[in-house]
A protein has these predicted regions:
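Short, surface-exposed, polar/charged, turn-prone segments marking secondary-structure boundaries
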Residues: 58-62, 84-88, 139, 145-149
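Sec-exported extracytoplasmic/periplasmic mature domains
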Residues: 49, 112-115, 138
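Short alpha-beta junction capping motif
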Residues: 33, 72-130
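A conserved amphipathic helix/loop scaffold
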Residues: 40-46, 51, 101, 147-150, ...
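Aromatic-Pro/Gly-enriched surface loop or interdomain linker
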Residues: 2-78
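Short, surface-exposed linear patches
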Residues: 52-56, 78-81, 102-103, 139-143, ...
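An acidic, glycine-rich "communication" segment
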Residues: 4-16, 22, 26-28, 120-161
């Protein structure tokens, strides 16, 4: 079982949002996974609040990492990810971190089980130190020049202020 030492230091001090697993019924049960970048929270959640066919829970990193198991995924119809973990922005260049091993194993097992994921926008920039993530997403956004799929690549063109 994972413990606190498996969570990167920059996530340990984070205060995650609370979540409840919705009751299964006629509505779609969606797990919204967020954190790692600023966004219009009201606008984002309004999309889901305004759809009477959806009920959702929101979980933020690092707590979200514990939700990535086939057993947990069975409680939801789909995960919608609008997260960007694995990057710590500072005064200079960003620092990159791999996810904990328990998260990697859980995500792989979800893939093998056919658990549906919807990966939005910022997910392409998540986990840059973990090459397998680019394969899962089907692409990669690079904040700095680095290798992607074994090829030296320039950054993707975003100017970090």
């Amino acid at each position: 079982m994972a413990d606190r030492d498996d969570i990167p230091d920059y996530h340990r001090t984070a205060v995650p949002a609370s979540t409840q697993i919705p009751k299964q019924g006629e509505k779609l049960n969606i797990l919204l996974v967020t954190r790692g970048h600023p966004f219009d929270r009201d606008g984002f959640f309004d999309i889901f609040d305004g759809n009477p066919q959806i009920q959702y829970s929101n979980v933020e990193h690092p707590a979200a990492q514990y939700m990535f198991t086939p057993e947990m995924a069975d409680k939801f119809d789909c995960y919608v990810q609008y997260d960007m973990p694995g990057i710590k922005f500072g005064s200079d260049t960003p620092e990159y971190f791999e996810p904990p091993e328990f998260y990697k194993e859980g995500l792989r097992a979800m893939g093998e089980a056919g658990s549906p994921l919807v990966l939005l926008h910022h997910c392409a920039a998540a986990w840059p130190a973990w090459p397998e993530w680019a394969e899962i997403v089907g692409g990669q956004f690079l904040y700095t020049p680095m290798q992607s799929r074994g090829i030296d690549c320039p950054d993707s063109g975003y100017n970090i202020d």
